[in-house]
Amino acid sequence: MTDVGKADWLAVEVQDARLQVWAMQGGSALETATAECDPAGLTSASAFDAALKTLTAPWQLPRLPVFVAGLPVGWTDAAPRMVPCTATAEGATPLPTDNFDLQVIPALRQQSPSGLLRGAETRIAGFLSLNKDWDGVVCLPGATSVWAQISAGEVVSFQTFLTGELLDLLGDGTPAEGTALDDTA
């Protein structure tokens, strides 16, 4: 167990119906907290502030910088950046709230095929920080999987696929009985 009180910043990712927070000291994660959340409820800075305060309350931390990826587009000034571009912007967009000093990391947008990455750009940046000269494709599996083409340190293009999410929507992953289609005729 690490001393979460030594954290000097927080990393936050909003993904699908999950809010995940890492208490960080430099480049090391000290603690992680995850909560299920209704993305429809995170429609304002004050709603996000309340959800984050509830999730981090057990840590009893002072006011720290909080870097956030994956927020819904529209309620911050962090306009998505068009690819090709670096995975993360030089500067995040400040969004102070009652309890936190949020720094919103802009999403990535693609014109054709139309696409938006909210949160995956930070995982790509993390991969590239460990693989400086990477030139190729990065696959990020998850409820929505991302395949991103990387060249010269930039995200050139990307494609997303509803893998796990689609499987959940279709059922428990077991094939239907052979008569299931016959019954619909």
Locations of regions flagged by a protein language model:
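Gly/Thr-rich phosphate-binding beta-strand-loop-beta motif of the actin/hexokinase/Hsp70
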Residues: 2-32, 134-152
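Short beta-strand-loop/turn "lid" adjacent to the catalytic site in phosphate-handling enzymes
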Residues: 53-117
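Ser/Thr/Asn(+Pro)-rich, low-complexity disordered segments
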Residues: 25, 31-39, 50
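Short active-site-proximal "capping" loops at secondary-structure junctions
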Residues: 37-40, 72-74
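Conserved active-site "lid/cap" helical segment
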Residues: 29, 42-62
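Flexible, charged surface loops at secondary-structure boundaries
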Residues: 2-6, 15, 57-63, 97-98, ...
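Long, hydrophobic N-terminal alpha-helical segment
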Residues: 20-23, 40-45
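Glycine-rich phosphate-binding loop plus the immediately following alpha-helix
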Residues: 40, 107-137, 144-185
